[in-house]
Curated annotation (Swiss-Prot):
Protein name: Dihydroxy-acid dehydratase
Domain of life: Bacteria
SS bond partners: none
Subunit details: Homodimer.
């Protein structure tokens, strides 16, 4: 029988000192026989998706105590990608994922916690905590802070979000007053940005992985229904703890729940809902922590047969995450996938014996439960606030239209092929990714002329200076995990391309990555990256590039042997993977770059690189 990890510090005469310190935190004699559960919070006043989490940790802690456990809360960092966007702050975003994973490991292992409740929300926090959960492999439940309500203004007929503010700001035809109105209306409440951006995509994927409760990805942060998710998580983690440590049920551990079939479910959901391309990067990294053989090849294979069943901002202006919830949330998308025989329904979850059981209970098209129907009617109030659980607004009806609603059936899919695709070719030999859900059908096959920039800063300046014209393929290189370092998001360049009216006549190709708010012909994660010697570093301005999404290919159109000739010329000059532009890089980022892999490996640390330094 597995032993409670916490007994290392709470049992035996030699642990008198440790117990004395535990007592100083408020523990009493009877507590030393209970499981010690880490409440991993990520509250910060820097991030709207986390600004309301201050009291959530103690809410979960009180429920853990009611269920017979001891709760100990700690905090980890959280970077707001939107605020860090467009300047050197973005260099720190992706590396923060590893710091979050490490900090959770350090705290949980140093204090021998038995289990965790992870309170996450925004872009790198959920994946960082998922990496830690798989690394530690102790019972865990995820509960996120929830999505922001979509913005409302009389000046726009559709819901607003962060991207609207970015795009309109660069539109020279928009008045200062109009820009100010959009800015003030775009992000009205606490919560993760309201579209199917990276944060919400990842929180939705925790449902598909089986590590969170139904509704985790879609109940808006302001709604009173979200309180129950935190409360249930507190009770559930104690049950999972006892299942593992007292009943020897290893099926409740993260690696048992998050097996390869579950990861296939997660990427299937991601493709079906047109999620952020960042999710590919994160799923690859999380799978490596779980020691799973889950690769870009698996993602490419699945992307070829999964249809797009949901279309949400930034891929459309019609729907935001609050609309997905009204249509039945993630459980209803999973239900449609299951009916199309596209889902592994035998996977266990933290709350149900199998995914099939979960779908039967929570899919609004299957269940007859009035309680479930009421749950998915939880909607936005349209009142600006930073307070969680502050409103109880309900939609008058559910959106169960699977032919023309927010969520579609397989038979009525938005497209037969899903919202994400992996492309390969002579400038991306190990692959690159594109969110096809955000690409206009007219440019699924696109031949354009390369316009090469050596940094995001240069790309932004040239786009705003009208140096980029229709028919261009803007290449932004040396922005990968190693080259950046930190693999910056390119939301400003793609937003400015749209501002200039080039959204359907230009492409952007980078070894960096994109915000979940990006749409258009934006292709990222080119691997190998330029700083690792990738062929994207050999492209010259004026080269012709052919992008063929239906055939999953991307190539620079050169005579046979031309790339090899360019590489030989480059090598003859003594080329090294150094930055071809001035950029101040801290020692912390240099350490990250030293071990970072390219995006096709999840941009994780490769400790084998240390061997070459010894």
């Amino acid at each position: 029988m597995p032993q409670y990890r916490s007994r290392t510090t709470t049992q035996g005469r030699n642990m008198a000192g440790a117990r004395a310190l535990w007592r100083a935190t408020g523990m009493k004699d009877e507590d030393f026989q209970k499981p010690i559960i880490a409440v991993v919070n990520s509250f910060t006043q820097f991030v709207p998706g986390h600004v309301h989490l201050k009291d959530m940790g103690q809410l979960v802690a009180r429920e853990i105590e009611k269920a017979g456990g001891v709760a100990k809360e700690f905090n980890t960092i959280a970077v707001d990608d939107g605020i860090a966007m467009g300047h050197d702050g973005m260099l720190y975003s992706l590396p923060s994922r590893d710091i979050i994973a490490d900090s959770v490991e350090y705290m949980v292992n140093a204090h021998c916690a038995d289990a965790m409740v992870c309170i996450s929300n925004c872009d790198k926090i959920t994946p960082g905590m998922l990496m830690a959960a798989m690394r530690l492999n102790i019972p865990v439940v995820f509960v996120s802070g929830g999505p922001m309500e979509a913005g409302k203004t009389k000046l726009a007929e559709h819901g607003l979000d962060l991207v609207d503010a970015m795009v309109i700001a660069a539109d020279s035809s928009a008045s200062d007053e109009y820009v100010a109105e959009i800015e003030r209306s775009a992000c009205p409440t606490c919560g993760s940005c309201s579209g199917m951006f990276t944060a919400n995509s990842m929180n939705c994927l925790t449902e598909a992985l089986g590590l969170s409760l139904p509704g985790n990805g879609t109940v808006v942060a302001t709604h009173s229904d979200r309180r129950a998710l935190f409360e249930r998580a507190g009770h559930l983690i104690v049950d999972l703890c006892k299942d593992y440590y007292e009943r020897e049920n290893a099926n409740v551990l993260p690696r048992s729940i998050g097996n390869k079939a579950a990861f296939e479910n997660a990427i299937t959901l991601d493709i079906a809902m047109g999620g952020s391309t960042n999710t590919i990067l994160h799923l690859l990294a999380i799978a490596q922590e779980a020691e799973l053989d889950f690769t870009m090849e698996d993602i490419d294979r699945i992307s070829r047969y999964v249809p797009q069943l949901c279309k949400v901002a930034p891929n459309t202006q019609k729907y935001h995450i609050e609309d997905v919830h009204r249509a039945g949330g993630i459980m209803s998308i999973l239900g449609e996938l299951a009916r199309g025989n596209l889902l592994n329904v035998d996977c266990p979850t933290v709350h149900s014996p199998t995914m099939a059981d979960a779908i039967a209970q929570w899919d609004i098209t299957q269940t007859g439960s009035a309680e479930v129907a009421e749950f998915y009617k939880a909607g936005p109030a349209g009142i600006p606030t930073q307070t969680a659980f502050s409103q109880s607004t309900r939609w008058q009806s559910l959106d169960g239209d699977r032919a023309d609603g927010c969520i579609r059936s397989v038979e009525h899919a938005y497209s037969k092929e899903g919202g994400l695709a992996v492309l390969t070719g002579n400038i991306a030999e190990q692959g690159c990714v594109v969110k096809t859900a955000g690409v206009d059908e007219s440019i699924l096959v696109f031949e354009g002329t390369a316009y090469v920039t050596e940094s995001q800063d240069q790309a932004v300046a040239d786009i705003l200076a009208d140096k980029v014209t229709a028919g261009s393929v803007v290449i932004v290189r040396y922005e990968g995990p190693k080259g950046g370092p930190g693999m910056q998001e390119m939301l400003y360049p793609t937003s400015y391309i749209k501002s200039k009216g080039l959204g359907k006549s230009c492409a952007l190709l980078t070894d960096g990555r994109f915000s979940g708010g990006t749409s258009g012909l934006s292709i990222g994660h080119v691997s190998p990256e330029a700083a690792a010697g990738g062929a994207i570093g050999l492209v010259k301005t004026g080269d012709k590039i052919l992008i063929d999404i239906p055939n999953r290919s991307i190539n620079v159109l050169l005579e046979d042997g031309e790339l090899e000739k360019r590489r030989a010329e480059q090598d003859a000059k003594g080329w090294k993977p150094e930055l071809p532009r001035p950029r101040k890089v801290s020692s912390a980022l240099k350490a990250y770059a030293l071990l970072a892999t390219s995006a096709d490996k999840g941009a994780v640390r490769d400790l084998k690189k240390l061997e070459s330094l010894q």
